Amino acid sequence: MNARGLGSELKDSIPVTELSASGPFESHDLLRKGFSCVKNELLPSHPLELSEKNFQLNQDKMNFSTLRNIQGLFAPLKLQMEFKAVQQVQRLPFLSSSNLSLDVLRGNDETIGFEDILNDPSQSEVMGEPHLMVEYKLGLL
């Protein structure tokens, strides 16, 4: 009903949403939907990719559940607090950190992996001006 008490004369009008293109050949509407991000639409390239990305997280969960079953709730809570404390301690932003204490807590200090050989700090891709990097980290820039 409109202000005069009469119904709309355009009963068979088409809504605006149906006027937009749809289907496999639809063009992306930047004004209504914003920029499209291809990264979110991609599927993992290999079935093992997701497993490899979450390997350390799954390993930690398994270790914590085993530790909880053996020693109770205190042991995994203590280890998780130590993990948080160790992850917060870092070097200056322009220096690479090996995070040796985190490796010791996880038990990775006795193993040799490809990251031990191929992760040479002198060949790092991220080399910047030390003063600028510290100022950025402290929020001065």
Curated annotation (Swiss-Prot):
Pfam families on file: UMP1
Instruction: Recount the UniProt induction comment for this entry.
Output: By IFNG/IFN-gamma.
The answer to whether the entry has keyword Membrane is yes
- Write out the annotated subcellular location: Cytoplasm, Cytosol; Nucleus; Microsome membrane
- Entry GO CC: cytoplasm; cytosol; endoplasmic reticulum; membrane; nuclear speck; nucleus
What is the tissue specificity? Strongly expressed from the basal layer to the granular layer of healthy epidermis, whereas in KLICK patients there is a gradual decrease of expression toward the granular layer.
Residue window of motif High-affinity association with the preproteasome: 68-72
GO BP annotation list = proteasome assembly
Give the position(s) of the covalent cross-link described as Glycyl lysine isopeptide (Lys-Gly) (interchain with G-Cter in SUMO2): 39
Per the UniProt entry, the disulfide pairs are none
The entry's keywords: Chaperone, Cytoplasm, Endoplasmic reticulum, Ichthyosis, Isopeptide bond, Membrane, Microsome, Nucleus, Palmoplantar keratoderma, Ubl conjugation
Sorted alphabetically, which InterPro entries does this protein's record hold? Ump1 (IPR008012)
Q: Where is the signal peptide?
A: none
Functional summary from the UniProt entry: Molecular chaperone essential for the assembly of standard proteasomes and immunoproteasomes. Degraded after completion of proteasome maturation. Mediates the association of 20S preproteasome with the endoplasmic reticulum.
User: Which disease is the protein involved in?
Assistant: Keratosis linearis with ichthyosis congenita and sclerosing keratoderma: A keratinizing disorder characterized by ichthyosis, palmoplantar keratoderma with constricting bands around fingers, flexural deformities of fingers and keratotic papules in a linear distribution on the flexural side of large joints. Histological examination of the skin of affected individuals shows hypertrophy and hyperplasia of the spinous, granular and horny epidermal layer.
Report quaternary structure and partners.
Constituent of preproteasomes, but not of mature 20S proteasomes. Within the preproteasome, may directly interact with PSMB1/beta6, PSMB4/beta7, PSMB5/beta5, PSMB6/beta1 and PSMB9/beta1i. Interaction with PSMB8/beta5i has been observed in PubMed:10973495, but not in PubMed:10926487. Forms tetramers.
**Membership in a protein family:** Belongs to the POMP/UMP1 family.
| The protein's name in its UniProt record | Proteasome maturation protein
- In its UniProt entry, the species of origin is given as Homo sapiens
